[in-house]
A protein has these predicted regions:
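N-terminal Rossmann-like or analogous alpha/beta NTP/dinucleotide-binding catalytic cores
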Residues: 2-175, 238, 265-293, 298-303, ...
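Glycine- and acidic
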Residues: 53-62, 85-93, 253-261, 325-331, ...
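Short, well-ordered beta-strand elements within core beta-sheets of diverse protein domains
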Residues: 134, 260-262, 332-336
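Active-site cores that bind ATP or allylic diphosphates and position pyrophosphate for catalysis
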Residues: 94, 100, 131, 145-311, ...
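Long, charged, mostly alpha-helical binding arms that flank functional sites
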Residues: 288-368, 372
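Substrate/cofactor-recognition hotspot
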Residues: 348-602
């Protein structure tokens, strides 16, 4: 491992590959034409100033989730660390699924995580935001080249016949009756596909490789299909579209990507990736050396699902309030819950990159968040289950029931403030005759070891006075409605007499004089099962009925004045964030629980 700034960079197999390529000059002779292009375009360019090029290539057909966040941190982070650039590419080759709403949300998520797709080499600013659909002309040209070179053919079998003739792991495939067509026939038929003369599904263009290959992905995979659908970028210009496995390597090569990093499910596709780029380099359409694909294990996080289909089901069936529900593992959901970009980056670094699937405990993510917020989140007191505490001798000690005093406490503990850093101003809040305390901080008959309020016991109101409990009032059902105590004069925190009376405990409280009512949303895990959809289980059966509890709390004024998205540590309760959608709307004070002070996940 090496230390870079404050971040610990742990070596992994991808870093080792990149370092070896840099040491041996694998890509040192590359040219860069100033944007994506074919061999001739890059030949006319300059030596590539980027030592490596990676890419983050989502399909714009849904909201990004925590697994994508790992990939974003990996690809942008490697480019940053090795003097390269990471391309932001939308893999929008499927005309039926893409929506601009998703494009915008993805760009916003990447920037929120702390990354951008700009480069500035030698004073030349470039944006590397690309759309795969802008490469359709080249992809079509590449397909025609493969046909004329005898590497592709138009197949008019039914989908069912193609499936049967493909064979399986124990049985080789059977050649299509159309496989022996001449390149001239295939080219004419392919152009009829392009010109809309064939119905959807009537034919596909297939690569001509090996129907007996032990790798089923090399048994003449389909590379173009007929699909009449309006594309968000190209409109109705095309009625044929490339398959993802054909488009993806070409996109990488046009953009001069050096290290194409994918998840493990694409490992079996790598031989086709390499085969296709070798053919197109042979034909002079693309520049050698071509990109190489490397696979890593995707993120499996306990108590979380990341299937877009299943997440959409949660939204559509109103199991959650939307894609940004704070219980969702989407980046918009994590952001609204109160997770920080720094915590997610730390998490991605900490879990590392491996080639073997494993499960990461959710507590690891929460631990990274606590680590980030510990020194940043201002403290404040909030009472989540309030009961009134009446200081019965207040007027006797201070002259009137309406008298109040200011109390102060640090916004951040002194231990969290770095040397030379100016501490933030203290919080100021009022104490008076009536204050709010947690209901659990009073017991009429205390259990053994209980140190908080019970008749005759002495405790400190944190930042305020020492008090002695005298009793309580109850309603007809026997529920405590008020706790009664006497204030002990001369014991206020921060005054010379503060330690004159020893208190068994200090409890949090909020004054009735300036406390503000707040809606506090206590979020917990969305599922009760650590692997809710593993082994064919119905994930809906594992929904946690207690994943959201809403309480009316009382908070000190510094918390009520929070801006949306501002994070705090509610003393003793955990970390909370002012809700970015609802806080402040119509004067409402709304907080979400991000996580507790300790791990609650085991």
């Amino acid at each position: 491992a090496e230390i870079e700034g404050q971040a610990l960079r742990t070596s992994n197999f991808l870093r080792q590959v990149i370092e070896k390529d840099l040491a041996t000059g694998t890509y040192a002779q590359r040219q860069w034409g100033g944007g994506p292009g074919d061999a001739a375009f890059h030949d006319a360019g300059q030596p590539d100033p980027a030592k490596i090029r990676t890419r983050f290539p989502p399909e714009p057909n849904g909201y990004l989730h925590v697994g994508h966040a790992k990939s974003i941190c990996l690809n942008f982070g490697l480019a940053r660390d090795y003097g390269g650039v990471c391309h932001m590419r939308f893999d929008d080759t499927n005309p039926e699924k893409e929506e601009k709403e998703y494009v915008d949300s993805i760009l916003d998520a990447v920037q929120w995580l702390g990354f951008n797709w700009e480069s500035n080499f030698n004073g030349k600013q470039e944006s590397h935001l690309y759309y795969a659909s802008n490469y359709f002309d080249f992809m079509y040209r590449a397909a025609e080249y493969l046909i004329t070179a005898g590497h592709a053919y138009v197949d008019e079998q039914t989908a069912e016949d193609m499936r049967i003739n493909r064979g399986d792991f124990g049985k080789p495939g059977v050649d299509s009756p159309f496989r022996s067509r001449s390149p001239e026939e295939n080219l004419a038929r392919f152009r009829e596909m392009r010109d809309g003369k064939l119905a959807d599904g009537a034919a596909v263009l297939r690569a001509k490789i090996d129907m007996a290959s032990p790798n089923i992905n090399l048994r003449d995979p389909a590379i173009y299909r007929i699909r009449r659908a309006t594309h968000h970028n190209t409109g109705d210009a095309w009625c044929i579209y490339p398959m993802y496995t054909f488009a993806h390597p070409i996109e990488d090569a046009l953009e001069q990507i050096t290290h194409s990093i994918a998840t493990l499910e694409f490992e079996d596709q790598r031989p086709f990736y390499d085969w296709l780029l070798e053919r197109l380099c042979e034909g002079g359409l693309l520049k050698a050396p071509p990109p190489r694909q490397y696979e890593f294990a995707r993120l499996n996080l306990t108590y979380v699902i990341t299937s877009k289909r299943k997440l959409a089901q949660l939204v559509n069936e109103k199991k959650v309030s939307g894609w940004d529900d704070p219980r969702m593992p989407t980046i918009v959901g994590l952001r609204r819950r109160g997770y920080t970009p720094e915590a997610i980056q730390l998490f991605a670094e900490r879990i590392g990159v491996t080639k073997s699937d494993s499960w990461i405990d959710y507590s690891t993510l929460d631990g990274c968040l606590r680590e980030d917020l510990e020194n940043k989140a201002h403290r404040g007191m909030a009472v989540l289950d309030p009961v009134k505490l009446v200081l019965t001798n207040w007027a006797e000690v201070f002259g009137s029931d309406g008298y109040t005093e200011d109390c102060t406490q640090p916004a951040l503990p002194h231990s969290t403030i770095a040397e030379g850093q100016t501490p933030p101003p203290d919080r100021v809040f009022k104490i008076g005759k009536d204050v709010w305390i947690e209901r659990e901080d009073f017991e009429e008959v205390p259990p053994k070891g209980y140190k908080r309020l019970f008749p005759g016991n002495v405790v400190r109101l944190k930042g305020g006075y020492v008090i002695e409990c005298t009793g309580c009032a109850k309603d007809a059902e026997g529920k405590v409605t008020e706790v009664h105590a006497k204030v002990i004069p001369g014991t206020k925190s921060g005054t010379p007499g503060a330690d004159s009376v020893k208190a068994k405990a200090a409890i949090t409280w909020v004054g009735n004089a300036d406390g503000v009512s707040a809606e506090v949303r206590l979020y917990d895990r969305l599922f009760t099962d650590p692997q809710p959809d593993a082994g064919g289980k119905n994930f809906l059966d594992a929904l946690n009925p207690d994943s959201l509890k809403v309480v009316t709390a009382v908070v000190e004024p510094s918390l009520a004045a929070a801006k949306p998205d501002q994070k705090f540590q509610f003393e003793r309760h955990g970390y909370f964030v002012a809700d970015r959608a609802d806080h402040g709307v119509g004067g409402k004070v709304v907080f979400n629980r991000v996580t507790g002070l300790k791990d609650r996940w085991n």
